[in-house]
Amino acid sequence: MNNIIKQIEQEQMKQDVPAFRPGDSVEVKVWVVEGSKKRLQAFEGVVIAIRNRGLHSAFTVRKISNGEGVERVFQTHSPVIDSIAVKRRGAVRKAKLYYLRERTGKAARIKERLN
C-alpha cells in the first residue's frame, strides 16, 4: 500500500523546480482565475521558509507591497504554479527568516551570495 502511494506521489511531482534556498529572491508565476478568464500573476519576493515534504513541499515568499508586508505560502508541486524563477541569491545563516517580519527598509536587506 505504501509503495503505491509513493509511486502516485512521484508521478505528480514537478521535475522542473529550480534549486533555491531561504534568502533568495524569486518570482513565482501563478495561474489566477477571474470569472471565466485565466491569467498569469507574478509574485516576487524573498523566500523566508522552505518545507521539504516530498509532494507536500511548500515555501513562503515575503514582499513589501505599498508599505505593507505580504507573505504567501506556495505548494511547490501545485498545478497552480506556472514557473519559479530565481532572481537573486541571498547569503543567510538561518533556514527560517522570520526575523525579517520585524525589520523594515534597509534593515531587511539581505547580502548577495557570490557563489
Curated annotation (Swiss-Prot):
Any one Gene Ontology BP term: translation
UniProtKB keywords: Ribonucleoprotein, Ribosomal protein
Zinc is among the record's keywords: no
Record InterPro entries: Ribosomal_bL19, Ribosomal_bL19_CS, Ribosomal_bL19_sf, Translation_prot_SH3-like_sf
SUPFAM superfamilies per the UniProt record, alphabetical: Translation proteins SH3-like domain
KW Kinase (keyword) present: no
PANTHER family linked to this entry: LARGE RIBOSOMAL SUBUNIT PROTEIN BL19M, RIBOSOMAL PROTEIN L19
Name of protein: Large ribosomal subunit protein bL19
Organism per entry: Edwardsiella ictaluri (strain 93-146)
Gene: rplS
